[in-house]
């Protein structure tokens, strides 16, 4: 939904969790009058269900990080890297070392555009602390020949 705030004319969200998908639909409905944009929520499992995102320019995602289930993010990342899009933005654990090699396998270049601490509220049963923080990196994947974001623009974000 954040893409609406920066001018996207069409936003397609893919969510596997039925409760999260319902929240996304409600939020789309709430924001409908504020933005002249089309929003779609697809409730599906990437890698299992048939999903058509052929009209998408940019993918923005926060995949499972594979902390509880090793390689849980792999099918989602592979799906994104196989799409014909201009860029892919991924929020992921700063500890992840597999993103760059995987992206390169699919012909993508990568740059980290933001590093920060991310607050993790105890949302799931495996969250044992009342509230925790983890280091994250926001990655931008782009095709070779496509330029990186100029360092001055990244510095302005900090």
Please place each PLM-identified region on the residue numbering.
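Class I S-adenosyl-L-methionine-dependent methyltransferase catalytic core
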Residues: 1-158
């Amino acid at each position: 939904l954040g893409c609406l705030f920066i001018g996207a004319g069409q936003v397609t969200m893919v969510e596997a969790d039925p409760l999260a998908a319902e929240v996304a639909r409600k939020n789309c409905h709430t924001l409908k009058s504020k933005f002249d944009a089309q929003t779609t929520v697809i409730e599906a499992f990437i890698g299992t269900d048939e999903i058509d995102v052929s009209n998408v320019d940019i993918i923005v995602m926060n995949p499972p990080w594979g902390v509880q289930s090793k390689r849980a993010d792999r099918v989602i990342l592979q799906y994104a890297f196989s799409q014909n899009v201009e860029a892919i933005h991924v929020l992921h654990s700063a500890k992840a070392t597999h993103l760059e090699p995987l992206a390169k396998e699919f012909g993508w270049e990568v740059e980290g555009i933001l590093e920060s601490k991310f607050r993790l509220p105890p949302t799931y049963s495996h969250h044992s602390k009342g509230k925790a923080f983890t280091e994250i990196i926001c990655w931008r994947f782009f095709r070779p020949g496509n330029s990186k974001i100029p360092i001055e623009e990244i510095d302005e974000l900090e």
